[in-house]
Design a protein with these regions (language model features):
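ABC family nucleotide-binding domain
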Residues: 1-204, 209
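Short, solvent-exposed coil/turn linker segments
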Residues: 65, 129-132, 217, 225, ...
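N-terminal compositionally biased, intrinsically disordered segments and leader/signal-like regions
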Residues: 193, 227-229, 245-246
Length: 267
């Protein structure tokens, strides 16, 4: 098992951003994480990325108990095990695409322009290597970010709303890259409000008020996926209280995060 969370809580005063969450992610799985704003998705990603620590519970990543590691060891995991992709591009404006990828190489104490160029080629941007971010479309900028995240050949890629700022065409280009990574055995955890993006994962989980309240598996059949809902009605105490239930959670433009994806309008 690549990732194991056991009874993890993250508490800020009276707020339980994560509330007794247990989760296992096998090596090579594509996991989609959905839920309304404030459900704990980003907190979960920060803890898995070694950028935050749980108040209670334990997290094991790649066989190591994160709570027992010192700062240098956590930095080593961030450098060598994890690749991060965010909704915001965070590219350095005065550096070219290939130089932005090489920034990650500096973090790994090595620079190799040839490898950085190969990373851009792998995301379809070989002909944009010398372009500044201002000369790239939003989709191209996001693909530079993906190339940068993959430069350390991570075992797990964490993507927080990676297509949130993209139109349908560029969204599909990013999803195609993720599909290739998945086929190569890379573990993916993707936070999204988009039901189409979520449906690309092998498995979807639904968070509500920091708790896991729904799960859905997808089985590939010659490129087509059929889905089975698991334990969706087995909600923890409080999920049916004053807040919304798992079945009722809605994003801004999707009626059912774990339902069938609706056709997406061109943006």
């Amino acid at each position: 098992m690549l990732l194991e969370l056991s009874h993890v809580s993250k508490i800020y005063g009276d707020l339980h951003a994560l509330d007794d969450l247990s989760l296992e992610v096998p090596r090579g799985q594509w996991l989609s994480v959905v839920g309304s704003s404030g459900s704990g998705k980003t907190t979960l990603m920060n803890i898995v990325a070694c950028m935050d620590t749980p108040t209670k519970g334990s997290v094991r990543l790649d066989g190591r108990e994160l709570g027992s590691l010192n700062a240098a060891q956590l930095t080593d995991i961030r450098k060598n095990v994890i690749g991060l992709v965010f909704q915001q591009f965070h590219l350095i404006g005065h550096l070219t695409a290939v130089e932005n990828v090489m920034v990650a190489q500096y973090y790994h104490s090595m620079t190799d322009e040839k490898e950085a160029l190969e990373a851009l080629e792998n995301v379809g941007l070989a002909d944009r290597a010398d372009h500044l971010p201002s000369q790239l479309s939003g989709g191209e900028q996001q693909r530079v970010c993906i190339a940068r995240a993959l430069i350390n050949h991570p075992e797990i890629v964490l993507a927080d709303e990676p297509t949130g700022n993209l139109d349908e065409t560029n969204e599909q280009l990013v999803l195609d890259i993720f599909s290739r990574l998945h086929e190569q055995g890379t573990t993916l955890i993707v936070v999204t409000h988009d039901s189409h993006v979520a449906s690309c994962g092998q498995r979807q989980i639904l968070l509500n008020h920091g708790r896991l309240v729904g799960e859905k598996l997808s089985e590939g059949d010659e490129g087509r996926r059929t889905s089975t809902m698991l334990d969706f009605d087995d909600k923890p105490p409080g999920a049916d209280g004053g807040g919304t239930t798992g079945a009722e959670i809605k994003s801004a433009d999707e009626a059912d995060p774990l339902g069938e994806p609706e056709p997406k309008e061109q943006r």
